[in-house]
């Protein structure tokens, strides 16, 4: 294992422990990845407990989502990671989490997007410099056909190049960043904002 792969794998392992510890990636849910080079990514192996990841729980894939390591099966949702790397060369890490807040809020919001507005913490997202604007988070209906789901995600990405993440209804959050630390920051920001939105909804009833 070369130094770069070892470092990126350790970042994925550390991310898993952190996200599991916060309750955002329970049991074997969720999947994480990091760009290895121009044509490859490292992803978590399917079905592994995210709070107990080791070096054997990460594998390399090409950007079509195909495993490059015989005997290791990538997550069924690998294509949702690799499409992001293919879409933007600036993306270096992708995190998919299954928190209670993201799951419940995605079911409560009517329509195809969540609009975050007037929150100071919006500035935690890459490229956002003020609380005064809107951050639109698209919500896609869950689909076991991942290629079909990716086909619905792609037009949104193309039309919204500053998009910081998206929700899958009743499922969870996808977010990303130039580095793993950036992606983790965005997960934290989303979770705070999702909790705020849920409290607003509960108090307004």
From Swiss-Prot:
GO terms for biological process: L-methionine salvage from methylthioadenosine; monosaccharide metabolic process. It catalyses: 5-(methylsulfanyl)-D-ribulose 1-phosphate = 5-methylsulfanyl-2,3-dioxopentyl phosphate + H2O. Its cofactor is Zn(2+). The keyword Lyase applies. GO terms for molecular function: methylthioribulose 1-phosphate dehydratase activity; zinc ion binding. It comes from Pseudomonas paraeruginosa (strain DSM 24068 / PA7). Catalyzes the dehydration of methylthioribulose-1-phosphate (MTRu-1-P) into 2,3-diketo-5-methylthiopentyl-1-phosphate (DK-MTP-1-P). Its EC number is 4.2.1.109. Binds 1 zinc ion per subunit. Disulfide bonds: none annotated. Belongs to the aldolase class II family. MtnB subfamily. HAMAP family: Salvage_MtnB. PANTHER family: METHYLTHIORIBULOSE-1-PHOSPHATE DEHYDRATASE (PTHR10640:SF7). Keywords: Amino-acid biosynthesis, Lyase, Metal-binding, Methionine biosynthesis, Zinc. The keyword Transmembrane helix does not apply. One of its GO terms (cellular component) is cytoplasm. Zn(2+) binds at residues 96, 98. The gene is mtnB. This is Methylthioribulose-1-phosphate dehydratase. Pathway: Amino-acid biosynthesis; L-methionine biosynthesis via salvage pathway; L-methionine from S-methyl-5-thio-alpha-D-ribose 1-phosphate: step 2/6.
